[in-house]
């Protein structure tokens, strides 16, 4: 993706993995075309434009274009905060130079997928893991660490720490993991610890996992990583966000569990947000 002049996909939407990563890389991308791979040929010269409204356009051949530069200093400052949505720590220092108020959303899923690759419970309950191939791969990944859990907390804290350091002292709001059960199952060793759901989109995800005995040990690793970032690294600009919280009672349970794991709301100005994404939140 870094080498491509532009990216065109048959499937996906604005929130798909390809679209999100393309935006972070500053790459021109059109997703969800349906049949681009059938209509375009290898070696064909085309021009891809994402500057003409909500729909991207693909033109035959190489077209010329004009570049218009805008002096941001003449525009003044907005009354509201303008913050970025970022996931890739490697892009943090590039975007930290932008005139923004911080990061409004950093998703942990990308860091877990790319830097860790293993299911949290496959690490904390490694001795229970039945998949021999997954065990071998996890052994290889964690060979340089004192234990399986520190592999998770060190890698996750480094990813978040890189983002927070780049933007310090501006806020970086980190959303705790929001994998759906089918996505958790795709992590190394994950299938053993995840139920098969008919509709994972509204299933065992978000806040409901954090205090549940079936995943509580995994959430403990996430909390420890965030504690390391805030306390050991001193990056207290990190705020935390809880996704898919269905009820007030559920939110209170999560707050209690986070305090149990060293993240007390209000301590050292720790702020804990809820992501407003389902009707009951409103």
Model-assigned labels for residue ranges:
Residues 70-282:
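Conserved alpha/beta-domain cores
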Residues 1-106, 110-130:
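Acidic, glycine-rich flexible loop/linker segments
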């Amino acid at each position: 993706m870094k080498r491509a002049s532009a990216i065109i996909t048959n499937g996906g939407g604005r929130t798909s993995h390809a679209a999100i990563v393309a935006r972070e890389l500053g790459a021109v991308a059109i997703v969800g075309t349906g049949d681009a791979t059938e209509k375009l040929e290898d070696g064909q010269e085309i021009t891809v434009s994402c500057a003409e409204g909500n729909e991207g356009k693909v033109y035959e051949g190489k077209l010329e274009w004009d570049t218009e530069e805008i002096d941001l200093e003449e525009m003044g400052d907005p009354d509201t905060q303008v913050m970025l949505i970022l996931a890739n720590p490697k892009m943090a220092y590039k975007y930290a130079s932008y005139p923004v108020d911080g990061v409004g959303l950093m998703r942990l899923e990308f860091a877990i997928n790319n830097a860790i690759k293993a299911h949290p419970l496959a690490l904390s309950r490694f001795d229970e893991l039945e998949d021999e191939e997954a065990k071998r791969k996890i052994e290889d990944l964690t060979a340089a660490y004192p234990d399986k859990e520190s592999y998770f907390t060190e890698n996750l804290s480094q990813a978040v720490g890189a983002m927070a350091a780049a933007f310090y002292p501006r806020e970086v709001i980190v959303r705790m993991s929001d994998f759906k059960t089918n996505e958790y199952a795709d992590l190394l060793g994950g299938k053993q610890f995840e139920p098969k759901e008919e509709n994972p989109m509204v299933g065992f995800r978000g806040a409901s996992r954090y205090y549940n005995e079936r995943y509580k040990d995994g959430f403990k690793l996430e909390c420890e990583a965030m504690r390391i970032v805030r306390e050991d690294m001193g990056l207290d600009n990190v705020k935390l966000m809880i996704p898919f919280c269905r009820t007030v009672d559920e939110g209170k349970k999560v707050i209690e569990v986070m305090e149990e794991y060293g993240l007390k709301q209000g301590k050292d100005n720790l702020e804990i947000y809820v992501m407003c994404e389902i009707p009951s939140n409103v």
